[in-house]
């Protein structure tokens, strides 16, 4: 088919063909990408209309996200077990702490430059580079303040426009000038979790979910958590709230056989 010949039925047939191979959220993501592509073609006057605009994806509703989270004591144990006598240890503690205490997305954290850690009103703040080029400023928890400044000082990060979280130069123990990738961060997190015997299959997003859950568990308000996490909707923030997991566990332990 040529581009002008594509009609809604063709897009709908493609979406239907994905069922059985992909989960509903993944199918909806595919459809969203197709819509965006055709929108771009319409704006560029390549096509007169978007054939995907009227196509609906599969129904999907979730009250709780699937991201694995840690208990507060597990997160504390993981952070405290990091050997901060090394630059890489200081870097890893700072990155994990950033995600826990600011609810930062991994992409926003890794996009930070050195100048994105700054002082305002006698407090340390961070500037997160969020989706679609949005900047999101957050004040630092006192622990995060310590983690960031210890890392920046030890690594001698003085160039404001340079990456904050960098890869290492082989086994030299020195930082390179290249920013960490999400794959680098994931491998680091899995390694740190294994070091302390955490068997939960956590990943880059787990610390964001852990931070939100613990904030709400200690009396934080959902609408404030939404602002801190930079979510468009409080419903999205609610997907990260795992307080009911502990309630459920307490209840099932009532079954005495």
What are these regions (language model features)?
Residues 1-257:
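Conserved catalytic core of the tyrosine transesterase superfamily
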């Amino acid at each position: 088919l040529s581009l002008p010949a594509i009609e809604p039925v063709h897009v709908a047939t493609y979406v239907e063909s994905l069922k059985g191979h992909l989960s509903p959220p993944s199918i909806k993501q595919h459809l969203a990408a197709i819509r965006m592509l055709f929108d771009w073609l319409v704006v560029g006057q390549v096509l007169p209309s978007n054939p995907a605009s009227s196509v609906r994806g599969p129904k999907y509703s979730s009250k709780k996200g699937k991201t694995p989270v840690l208990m507060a004591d597990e997160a504390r144990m993981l952070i405290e077990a990091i050997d901060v006598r090394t630059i890489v240890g200081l870097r890893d503690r700072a990155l994990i702490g950033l995600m826990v205490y600011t609810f930062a997305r991994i992409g926003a954290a890794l996009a930070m430059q050195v100048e994105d850690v700054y002082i305002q009103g006698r407090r340390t703040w961070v500037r997160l580079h969020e989706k679609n080029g949005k900047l999101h400023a957050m004040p630092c928890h006192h622990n995060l303040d310590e983690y960031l400044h210890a890392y920046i000082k030890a690594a001698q990060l003085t160039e404001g426009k340079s990456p904050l979280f960098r890869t290492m130069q082989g086994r030299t123990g020195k930082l390179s000038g290249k920013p960490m990738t999400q794959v680098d961060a994931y491998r680091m997190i899995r390694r740190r979790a294994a070091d302390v015997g955490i068997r939960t299959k956590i990943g880059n997003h787990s610390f964001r979910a852990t931070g939100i859950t613990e904030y709400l568990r200690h009396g934080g308000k959902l609408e404030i958590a939404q602002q801190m996490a930079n979510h468009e909707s409080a419903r999205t923030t609610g997907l990260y709230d795992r307080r009911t997991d502990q309630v459920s566990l307490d209840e099932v332990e009532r079954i005495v056989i």
